[in-house]
Amino acid sequence: MKEFKAVFPKALIIFIIFTILCGGIYTIFITGISQLIFPKQANGSIIEVNGKKYGSVLLAQQYNDEKHLWGRIMNIDTNTFVDENGKKLAYSAPSNLSPASKEYEALVQERVDKIKENHPEQDEQAIPVDLVTCSGSGLDPHISVAAAKYQINRIAKNNNMEVKDVENIIDKYTSGKLFGVLGEKTVNVLEVNLAIDGILK
């Protein structure tokens, strides 16, 4: 008991000091630095034009009309979780279906059929895999350059645009490899679609 009484005050003081340092000072310091150096990224990388917010470059938005670039398959569940007021909350995750299952095979085939139906001019071309599969998060905002180029003719036709103009937009919103060597080039779907709509210049 005596040992406890001797150690406890010291432990409590250390606990309080580190709580203030790590939970307070460090948090305030990092938040301040991020707001100073990376204000856009620190606030969610929101795309805002003329005071209107269109979304984040880090989160996918669903596009499935003929005029826009399609992204990866999104798995959004709005039936599982609700808040304290009963409002449905969006939840995203992979399907967890086995790649070897018949159910997954049928699901992918359905997606393949939809892609082919909307891109008849690409009948002989292999469909990029990211157009018929979802990412681990189900909210991936990027697609491969191949997946974007696969859709160019459809987008140009339905927007009365030149193919070259669509290509230029895709090139503008294509990110290179990390440090020039890691990963692959990717295209941000939301930015491309906002540019097609004339919102981003």
Swiss-Prot record:
InterPro entries, alphabetized: KdpC (IPR003820)
MF GO annotations: ATP binding; P-type potassium transmembrane transporter activity
Coarse class of the protein's main subcellular location: membrane
Annotated localization: Cell membrane
Membrane topology: Single-pass membrane protein
Gene Ontology cellular-component terms listed: plasma membrane
Keyword terms of this UniProt record: ATP-binding, Cell membrane, Ion transport, Membrane, Nucleotide-binding, Potassium, Potassium transport, Transmembrane, Transmembrane helix, Transport
Membrane-spanning parts: 13-33
Family under the similarity heading: Belongs to the KdpC family.
Function: Part of the high-affinity ATP-driven potassium transport (or Kdp) system, which catalyzes the hydrolysis of ATP coupled with the electrogenic transport of potassium into the cytoplasm. This subunit acts as a catalytic chaperone that increases the ATP-binding affinity of the ATP-hydrolyzing subunit KdpB by the formation of a transient KdpB/KdpC/ATP ternary complex.
Quaternary state and interactors: The system is composed of three essential subunits: KdpA, KdpB and KdpC.
The protein, known as: Potassium-transporting ATPase KdpC subunit
